[in-house]
């Protein structure tokens, strides 16, 4: 049995464990909310989720799955494992049905069939080699002309889509400007492409680290080297970027659009990066290339079919729009808050308010960054079904939807529309600020 088979099985078990863990995390949050309703009628504050036994088991299974996926990259090709990670969608359906008692529709079954069929093609015709590289060989591959050209193209793609995204933001923020359906589709697409292109590099660095770990176990190679630490730093940076963009993107856009875009972009760039860097395409002939591409198309079709219902997305969007208007009308703008109470000490009060506002803004950004990093591990007040860094996170499906609540989305949209000049503060922060102004008046 080839080593690629071992890597494939480890990856499958890891993906299944990740999905089982995330469903247990979701179940733990549901149990906590149900107990809060039973004990205090929903008025009592929720206990920390870490006290829930189901959640603790879920986080252990989740971490075990991530470790298995990390190990698997040392035994099989990146292009194979990146595509094979889509098997988690199949296991998620089964676990959501058994653990969360969710309904499985015909559309979900059809999507599952496409994903399974695509994975059969990918496994049968993918790269079956699993060589172990030395640090010198890995470093040499980073200076390969083909890989450098690919990196240049990748940077160009990221720059173009980032420019388009910023241009679209300017058009949206312009008062009275009509936004065409073209820009409404291009904005989330550009956001997903930038996120997937950079975030998928975490798979490359993870495979390099896994390769070094495997080399250290089979020889006298010492992990204590500049190359190992460089790979670790790059992995943490790209993985952190991916998780942050993933969390933010799901709060900004309807899941029916952004979910399949995220998943397809991440998988596509992960496969391309592995094929170019490790030169995995060299073993492909015309037949294997055709069947591998066909398998990828089947997987992408299946992922697209797993997007949430349009009706559900519209309902959420309508609710978000109404909440956005509520938040916008209830939270005073910066200009309203910074009106001086008197002409004598207006300047000093204005300065104090601005300084306090800047401080609260910085604290809010730090809190959001911390939340984004911990969200994928299930920590925090809200359950988030992000599954892994090394495989495409199971962020949303018809079974276990992953969307920020409407109030969070409204706050973010309000902040994005107002810009830096208008400080977007939470309600508690606003009350504290107004109280400070009145006490010093």
Swiss-Prot record:
Belongs to the NIPA (TC 2.A.7) family. The keyword Transmembrane applies. It comes from the Eukaryota. Acts as a Mg(2+) transporter. Can also transport other divalent cations such as Fe(2+), Sr(2+), Ba(2+), Mn(2+) and Co(2+) but to a much less extent than Mg(2+). Its main location: membrane. This is Probable magnesium transporter NIPA8. One of its GO terms (biological process) is magnesium ion transport. Signal peptide: none annotated. Residues 313-347 are annotated as: Disordered. One of its GO terms (cellular component) is early endosome. Residues 320-330 have a biased composition (Low complexity). It is a multi-pass membrane protein. Keywords: Cell membrane, Endosome, Ion transport, Magnesium, Membrane, Transmembrane, Transmembrane helix, Transport. InterPro entries: Mg_trans_NIPA (IPR008521). Residues 26-56, 101-105, 166-184, 244-255, 310-441 are cytoplasmic. GO terms for molecular function: magnesium ion transmembrane transporter activity. It comes from Arabidopsis thaliana. Residues 334-347 have a biased composition (Basic and acidic residues). The chain crosses the membrane at residues 5-25, 57-77, 80-100, 106-126, 145-165, 185-205, 223-243, 256-276, 289-309. The lineage of its organism: Eukaryota, Viridiplantae, Streptophyta, Embryophyta, Tracheophyta. Residues 1-4, 78-79, 127-144, 206-222, 277-288 are extracellular. It is found in: Cell membrane; Early endosome. Homodimer.
